[in-house]
Amino acid sequence: MLYNIPCRIYILSTLSLCISGIVSTATATSSETKISNEETLVVTTNRSASNLWESPATIQVIDQQTLQNSTNASIADNLQDIPGVEITDNSLAGRKQIRIRGEASSRVLILIDGQEVTYQRAGDNYGVGLLIDESALERVEVVKGPYSVLYGSQAIGGIVNFITKKGGDKLASGVVKAVYNSATAGWEESIAVQGSIGGFDYRINGSYSDQGNRDTPDGRLPNTNYRNNSQGVWLGYNSGNHRFGLSLDRYRLATQTYYEDPDGSYEAFSVKIPKLEREKVGVFYDTDVDGDYLKKIHFDAYEQTIQRQFANEVKTTQPVPSPMIQALTVHNKTDTHDKQYTQAVTLQSHFSLPANNELVTGAQYKQDRVSQRSGGMTSSKSLTGFINKETRTRSYYESEQSTVSLFAQNDWRFADHWTWTMGVRQYWLSSKLTRGDGVSYTAGIISDTSLARESASDHEMVTSTSLRYSGFDNLELRAAFAQGYVFPTLSQLFMQTSAGGSVTYGNPDLKAEHSNNFELGARYNGNQWLIDSAVYYSEAKDYIASLICDGSIVCNGNTNSSRSSYYYYDNIDRAKTWGLEIS
């Protein structure tokens, strides 16, 4: 069985060296203003700086001081302390996934400085995960539930916005950190330096982690070691009411999985990701217009590349009650290389309107282009030599997905202590398979296949609303409703993937996943306590899951058997979720 690697970290020693005073600059984009030590500003729920106390949704913040003092080996260990947040790794050490309110990581939206980290390889129980250097972080904002029409799809479970450091009020300040993890006999080192010179601000960071096999009461588990490294740069320039920013970052991970086989059923088993790399270039522009109604304009754009190599091997021998066969050895090997290239641009305006209305409007365009190259080998050999068959395959896919969306959110203070937030987002999505070629070799026979070009499209409007009352001392009450929307990934729509001797087919007829979410909450801030509590209920439909093939067209007529495993994606699942959180 696959061994679920525990997330507990045992720290033997920690070194934290302050080069100079650490500066709290808490900015999400170059438009965000500096804040006092008594306030916590958040940006994820309103796409502009606002007090945490006035947030229309359940949100929690891991601030700079917590990150600076943390001796955890990963930011994931800080996230899992938040109620409603669960960290998993799908038995791939170091490949951390975030679940919120029971929803799979593929239904959690990951942002870096408000820019989405898309992952078209996402499946049933895995998404993009944590591919960021924590030494670059100023803070982390976690929104529970899909309560931000301002950021888009994928957020049925919630949103995690990683906000990076962007300069300071000194020429140079920084942190050098080294953590030894006795559970893996591994070290993690990181350094971050930031500062300001005239109208310029900067940040340079880097990290390296080399973790060994995990220690257990029964000894160290083989093949649980992993390694990652990252680098990042921020450059900003401020001129009057204009602010410009450039960010560059890179993160690379290599990992594998441990497999427990006490009965010796497998002669070979391995699941490896020798390379998972994310590279991004982002630009930001903000200006304070300070007109009668129009107050701020924000623009950002980015290019992002995610490359992955996946290698899998399974070899097993089973007895067969036939004198001509006696025993059959089946050996499967798969090697896949895929690359996702993303381009996106966002334009946003902030208005102050009469009758105490604060309006944010904007438009966004995003395109993902994915290429996948795979090679595989499957052999079947009997002990007697009666069966001796080997098939080698190669395939290549190209696909793309484009999204255009318009969004708006308005805060209306219509009476003393009362605030009503209303938001809407309209999507237009288009996905298409532009190329799908395959070839197989069996006993000297060559078979070529070419998939027909396919496409899928959708348009959807999602809404959210929140009503808040703050007429009591140190207490705010809220009631909220929001809709969730997750469009199928390119892998789920078009691609054929192989692992462990099984094949999963895409389904171009998939529908988007939907949810309706309700919440009642209260915040208390007094007597040195800040308490946020919420009761939530969610109804979801059209969840996408993988099913066993039964000879249907989507499976190319293949049927699952004891020797071959075939699956396909379909909309089948519904879910009702409810819970209580106090933090």
Regions found by a protein language model. Give the residues of each.
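Hydrophobic, lipid-facing positions within transmembrane beta-strands of outer-membrane proteins
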Residues: 39, 96, 158, 172-174, ...
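Transmembrane beta-barrel wall of Gram-negative outer-membrane proteins
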Residues: 180-210, 220-258, 273-290, 294, ...
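Acidic, small-polar-rich N-terminal luminal/periplasmic segments of exported/outer-membrane proteins
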Residues: 21, 34-170, 185, 485, ...
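Transmembrane beta-strands of outer-membrane beta-barrel pores
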Residues: 178-184, 197-199, 208-212, 239-241, ...
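Extracellular loop and loop/strand-boundary signature of outer-membrane beta-barrel proteins
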Residues: 124, 177-178, 216-223, 263-273, ...
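Outer membrane beta-barrel strand-and-loop segments of large Gram-negative receptors
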Residues: 334-348, 403-405, 505-511, 517, ...
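N-terminal Sec signal peptide and the immediately downstream disordered periplasmic leader
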Residues: 1-82, 194-195, 229, 281, ...
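Face-selective signature of the C-terminal outer-membrane beta-barrel domain
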Residues: 243-251, 276-443, 452, 457-470, ...
